[in-house]
Curated annotation (Swiss-Prot):
Protein name listed in UniProt: UPF0178 protein RD1_0321
Entry similarity comment: Belongs to the UPF0178 family.
Domain of life where this protein originates: Bacteria
Pfam families: DUF188
InterPro entries the UniProt entry points to: UPF0178 (IPR003791)
Amino acid sequence: MTALYIDADACPVKSEAERVATRHRVKMYIVSNGGLRPSQNPLVETVIVPDGPDVADMWIADRCGTGDVVVTGDIPLAAKCIEAGALVLKHNGEALTSANIGNVLASRDLMADLRAADPFRQGGGKSFGKADRSRFLDGLERTLRKAATLG
């Protein structure tokens, strides 16, 4: 049976994911190292993991599999989940697959090297807007339908 795993630390689409999961009657796990208000929705389980690097990521990677959906902005976690057979979406609705994860990992590593080479660089990524939320909702809807046929 399909489950939805949310890497909740710094995830801007938790409430949107909950609405879609509820509509599909899919169990949703919101995984974090704390600081989240638990949902009253019986389909949503808030999982609080101990503090530490990548503890939430390991919890998700150890449990997801074929027919499950993972929402994360963490590219190494996405790679592990894809390897386990899960379908993976970024917060903006972009699907990460076995066909594109290698390039995404390489781009991530290149950007990390470029940031490290320029200690005076300021600013971050672009802001997360309505269009991103809309793409996420559409992507999650399609991905959950696909996952239902796999698991």
